[in-house]
Amino acid sequence: MKESEKVIEWIKQYFKDNGKDCNAIIGISGGCDSSVTAALLVKALGKDRVIGVLMPNGDQYDIDCSYQLVKFLDIKYYVININKPYLELTNEIDNKLKIDSKSYDIYRTNTPSRLRMATLYGISGLLNGRVANTCNLSEDYVGYSTKFGDSAGDFSPISNFTKTEVRELGEELGLPKNLIYKVPEDGMSFKSDEEKLGFTYEVLDKYIRTGEIDDLKIKEKIDKMHLANLHKIQLMPSYKKDGK
């Protein structure tokens, strides 16, 4: 059995156990991860139970890739532009705090992701849905995701696959090459993931799977990012009453 077929069976079982009549709600960016996840959902549930949500923040220069995917899969989709709430929220916070912080760029980058997840859950609540998480193992390992943003969801079909392995799933599923090999980026900074990370997914994926890496400085950077971002993938710590 191909790996993609195993994931498809897992998705079927998840919905059987957690909402046999529910729809799958998925944010569509047009990148490899959301494309592969959406294709897996269609294979598992049928196209009528998969609902895509395109969420540009104003004008999105590569939104054609998102339209290409939903048309290729022939799924129902909605386009919700988050630019107005994004500007209203960030401007309100800026006006009230009035501080010059080095975290400003991070906050401006993370906010759209959290608004998108709020949008997905809003739609999910209205359409009897379960929200698909589209993060992969490579992103999760170094914390390259937004807490309570794209790292959220009800179920996660590809979170145990590296970026390299997600592309292999895309090949198995017969997705268009331009979607499988689209250069990953955050959609805000106009820089690729690899430019921002300072190393390639090829190097990261090999390190994750084998522990092998040639550049010790990059190894140190990856290890540091992994430890610093574990809180994003672990359950929230809670006080244990009476030590229980």
Identify the meaning behind each predicted range:
Residues 114:
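Catalytic-core regions of hydrolytic enzymes
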Residues 35-36:
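Phosphate-binding Walker
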Residues 31:
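Conserved G/P- and acidic residue-centered "switch" motifs that form tight phosphate/ATP-binding loops
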Residues 3-26, 40-43, 48-51, 57-58, ...:
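ATP/NTP-dependent adenylation/nucleotidyl-transfer catalytic domains that generate, transfer
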Residues 61-65:
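N-terminal phosphate-binding loop and adjacent alpha-helix
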